[in-house]
């Protein structure tokens, strides 16, 4: 074989090795023509800036080549604790060139994200009492870890009604990445916030509350908005000196997404404890994000009888269970209401995590392990290869 042919084979192999992956994820909820692009870890900030300039030139050239009117392809860029990525809408030629770029790790389609709850009706309030007692027989709430003084709660959801009376003036509007309605017109975000930090219904009764709206009035958003929300929260916490003193509740889900998982983990590494919903599909949590990220605290849903809720996702990625059914909490316009789902379980973990972090001085990435140490092994029939640990706030009761 000639040296020339050997060189051709070598460069062909090298091209295959260096080409990024276009991840083949569950097609449900995919937004046509929209992508998330993640850079390799070794890429410097200067190289990332250079890549973005290259992307803009490439996008413009490929549109002109096909006589397509110019549209701004790039929609967002992110740097979350060194995790560099961007999103946008690009044609097939541009996507192929992105995949071939030496600094790109992978590309995946942008997808819808939505709330992870099931709305129910009833007249029961029991979650706070259950997580503050070892035995399932009490009806009061006990806490020896304080009330969340000096903790800030970031709610990434459908927004939060910051004027809700149960928030006692502690809530502020952060950013709206969903629409032009600067309030919670869905109710999901205000409900989860009430369990985390409401005066009557919550755990962090003295924490500051920040609303980050990424879902519309129907409870829908997408991965780009989600990562934009994470990025905004990290920057806000950094500017205000709140890293290491903040918690975040994510009662949302999309199909398994490497980009969502990586961004969520990096946000926690930056200094915010994160609790995420396992999901309500009665299957393994591994199929959904961010619940499939092993480094964050993934929460399954339990019933009043300390069994796994029938719809709760399960599996080795679930870290612990928390109350989920008929949870009464805050709604917009000073109303209250009952909801059920892993969306309602997760805020309990977020709240107790904030108490533990503040009182014991733990780093965010250590909080979930501590919660698992405190938890009670009381969940019956938790599912295949799933923990039986139920959230407990360590009150001694």
UniProtKB/Swiss-Prot annotation:
Gene3D superfamilies xrefs: Peptidase S8 propeptide/proteinase inhibitor I9, Peptidase S8/S53 domain
Q: State the PANTHER family in the record.
A: CEREVISIN-RELATED (PTHR43806:SF11), PEPTIDASE S8 (PTHR43806)
Function, as annotated, reads: Secreted subtilisin-like serine protease with keratinolytic activity that contributes to pathogenicity.
Tell me where in this chain the Peptidase S8 domain is found: 125-397
Q: Species name for this entry?
A: Trichophyton verrucosum (strain HKI 0517)
Q: Which keywords does this Swiss-Prot/TrEMBL entry list?
A: Glycoprotein, Hydrolase, Protease, Secreted, Serine protease, Signal, Virulence, Zymogen
Q: Which GO terms describe its molecular function?
A: serine-type endopeptidase activity
Name of the molecule in the record: Subtilisin-like protease 12
Q: Could you say which residues form the signal peptide?
A: 1-19
Task: Specify the propeptide location in this chain.
Answer: 20-116
Recorded superkingdom = Eukaryota
